[in-house]
Amino acid sequence: WNVGDDGFDTDQSWSGTLDNFVIINPAGHIFELDGPEGTYANGHTIKNGDVYVGIGQDLINVDANSIVDLMDIYFTDITGLNQINRVTAVGVTFNNIVLNVDSVSAYVNGTVPSGITAGQTPKANTSPLSWTWAKIAGLF
């Protein structure tokens, strides 16, 4: 919450899994998912999350060589300035990415992949996050 930079930033072939999360009002990109550097090329998975965009910039920012599976992520509080910057990166998959907008075409740079749709169904299980200050402050 209010990280002042990217909501979640991966670099240098991070190979983990981010599962069940909430990102609130980052100042930079929501997801800054850089590709591998050098010869080590591993991918990662990001799944089951809710994103409250607010002043965030790109919803999802990937490089041409990023390797990431994105699944079951809900974006809300989107403005006309937000977009998914690249949907043609070979190593990036989109599965059940839901934008709380009327039509996703204005928020995707290029042809909208089948895994990105408009809707209003959150994806994160927020009950394990009830202890956080963001939850106590009523931000989700």
Briefly describe each language-model feature range.
Residues 1-140:
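Extracellular beta-rich repeat passengers
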